[in-house]
């Protein structure tokens, strides 16, 4: 609930469909970074996801119900607007072992897999898109999201433009819940 404050029992489950933490709104002791590692420079997008997997798998995560940052989706030149084909993403295979013993981590990563699969499909990289989609445990993704994945590319592009227009005008929603 929005008024909860304290330790989260399961960071990955709580972060679906939206992450409970953003890099600009967190406090992490330096000793945690020294043990888990810092951001990986080889990843140009998704460094925070990789970092949170390493941290939340080993340490408790607490949240506050106080607003400490705002995320502005409409910033035109933000890193998140970089086309997927120009990004160096996480290799999800790095987390295979942890996923096998942590179903909520698997679901969390499957949400990123379908997001990237959709982006690759929209970008015309159907081979990469299909590769990611095959690695998803289907019950981890809502039926509507799976159905959207199978829409033709031109329809996905049109729907994305509608979503961007709505978001810019204050209507935010997710296809992941």
Identify the residue ranges that each predicted region occupies.
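A general structural signal for well-ordered secondary-structure junctions
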Residues: 39, 61-62, 105, 126, ...
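Catalytic core of nucleotide-sugar-dependent glycosyltransferases
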Residues: 67-75, 80-107, 126-138
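Structural register within alpha-helical repeat arrays
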Residues: 109, 113-116
């Amino acid at each position: 609930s929005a008024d909860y404050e304290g330790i989260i029992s399961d960071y990955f489950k709580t972060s679906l469909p939206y992450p409970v933490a953003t890099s600009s709104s967190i406090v992490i002791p330096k000793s945690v970074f020294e043990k888990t590692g810092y951001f990986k420079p080889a990843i140009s997008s998704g460094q925070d996801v990789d970092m949170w997997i390493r941290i939340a798998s080993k340490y408790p995560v607490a949240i506050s119900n106080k607003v400490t940052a705002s995320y502005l989706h409409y910033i035109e030149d933000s890193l998140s607007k970089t086309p997927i084909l120009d990004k160096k993403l996480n290799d999800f295979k790095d987390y295979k072992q942890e996923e096998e013993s942590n179903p909520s981590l698997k679901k969390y990563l499957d949400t990123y897999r379908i997001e990237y699969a959709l982006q690759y499909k929209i970008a015309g990289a159907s081979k990469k898109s299909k590769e990611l989609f095959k690695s998803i445990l289907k019950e981890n993704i809502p039926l509507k999201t799976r159905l959207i994945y199978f829409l033709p590319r031109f329809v996905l592009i049109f729907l994305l433009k509608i979503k961007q227009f709505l978001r810019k005008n204050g209507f935010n929603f997710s296809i992941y819940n």
